[in-house]
Regions:
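Acidic donor-binding loop of glycosyltransferase active sites
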Residues: 322-336, 349
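Conserved acidic donor-binding segment of nucleotide-sugar-dependent glycosyltransferases
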Residues: 368-375, 384-389
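Carbohydrate-associated surface elements
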Residues: 210, 228
Length: 423
């Protein structure tokens, strides 16, 4: 079957979990023999492993300006073309990665409700491309915050009286991270709009039982499809000579890098894990630089035992995990899956994570969970993993087993195929 994946881009400067998840799902379906079309919105895709197959739709620059200044009349064609040009998109990409939805209320609500002059203009272009050029069997919408597109597509399919209209699959994952940052009245409108417009999706999927249960009041009949990897890319006999803690996600406060830095310093001062090292990767944006300077100051007494990778590329993912003994990303919010965990498991590397969100479901015996989520308890958990006889080896075996049996791209493709066949 032919599947159009409508996906958002973060600018590719750092490890974006949602972007990587979309890539994994698209690649899994492609490996299973399906025709996959990648349709980006907001920002261009730059990673060579995940290239677009269509033009960019809803360019972030022109969509933002349209929502701000052209609510009652269409944006002039010349301005729309200028704002969507590569130089301005490059500027937007350099500023991408904000962790706040402040100032983005109009864009967010318009995309969820599927309403507004600018939305109508831009979704028309997208629909025309899908209907006249792609003729897909399935349209996969990568976030419920794009559900206004599902509404517009369904209405168009009905208008065209298509005998076999494409099925629409929509993903629900971690929406609250963005929506709950809106003003209270806007957040209420956003959740209400998602709940209302998900009826236009033929199937709704999410990445964990935890998130399905958390959002049960909003998302009915949600299917759980765990992300899956090409585990052969991660398989290795390589292991670091010294015990090495790895952090591989966006280097910011929300993802807890400062907590890990403090825990690492505690362990070095205690000396209970000889020759302990720390490797940090995953990229960052210009907004994260002041925070990173503070982290470097904390780690300064042990800088000879710390490696911070300043560049980020999807091609380097597997290589990073082969250089660490354990992965730890002490998130400061509840996440619905955590793809860095699955990558660690595929490499046979255990994890140490806070006992929050989906982590108890995702991790199982492939590592340790700790509570509360602070540097002291993180340090204690890491110390336990490295110093308890046999525990590290048992966790490594459990990680590899979990990867093969649950987080395998072949299993993921089969699961999504089953869901599509039922709708």
């Amino acid at each position: 079957m032919k599947i159009v994946f409508i996906i958002t881009s973060s600018g590719d400067a750092y490890y974006c979990g949602n972007c990587f998840r979309d890539n994994l799902m698209a690649q899994a379906m492609k490996r299973a023999g399906h025709e996959v079309v990648i349709m980006p919105i907001y920002l261009p895709l730059r990673q060579k492993e995940f290239q677009a197959d269509t033009p960019l739709f809803f360019p972030a620059t022109s969509y933002y300006v349209g929502q701000k200044f052209f609510k009652k009349k269409p944006m002039p064609a010349w301005l729309k073309k200028l704002l969507g040009a590569q130089p301005l998109l490059d500027i937007a990409m350099s500023m991408a990665g904000t962790t706040t939805s402040d100032g983005m209320e109009d864009m967010t609500l318009s995309m969820i409700h599927g309403e507004g002059t600018t939305f109508d203009d831009m979704v028309r272009e997208m629909i025309d491309w899908i209907v006249t050029k792609e003729h897909p069997d399935v349209v996969y919408i990568s976030s419920s915050m794009l559900v206004g597109i599902a509404k517009a597509l369904k209405q168009e399919f009905k208008k065209l009286k298509m005998a076999l209209p494409p099925k629409i699959v929509c993903v629900a994952q971690d929406e609250e991270v963005w929506i709950d940052g809106l003003r209270e009245e806007d957040a209420t409108l956003a959740w209400r709009g998602i709940a209302e417009n998900l009826k236009y999706a033929d199937a709704v999927i999410t990445t964990s039982l935890y998130y399905k249960e958390k959002m049960a009041s909003l998302f009915n009949a949600v299917h759980v499809v765990y992300p899956g990897l090409e585990i052969e890319k991660y398989a290795t006999e390589e292991h670091p000579a010294n015990p090495t803690i790895g952090f591989f996600y966006r280097m910011n406060k929300a993802d807890g890098l400062d907590v890990l830095a403090e825990a690492f310093v505690m362990l070095k001062q205690k000396g209970s894990v000889p020759h302990l090292k720390l490797r940090i990767g995953g990229g960052y944006t210009s907004n994260d630089k002041p925070f990173l300077r503070q982290v470097r100051k904390v780690l300064a007494p042990y800088k000879e035992d710390v490696v911070i990778e300043d560049t980020y590329d999807w091609a380097h993912h597997a290589a990073f995990y082969k250089k660490v003994s354990v992965i730890c990303v002490p998130l400061q919010f509840e996440e619905s899956v955590g793809l860095y965990l699955l990558e660690a498991f595929a490499t046979g590397v255990p994890v140490v994570e806070p006992d929050e969100g989906s982590f108890s479901e995702i991790v199982g015996n492939a590592g340790l969970l700790y509570h509360p989520n602070d540097a002291l308890h993180l340090a204690e958990a890491l110390e336990k993993l490295f110093t308890t006889p046999g525990l590290y080896e048992q966790s490594c075996k459990a990680a590899s087993k979990l990867s093969a049996e649950r987080y395998n791209c072949c299993i993921v493709a089969e699961k999504l195929e089953e869901i599509i066949k039922t709708i």
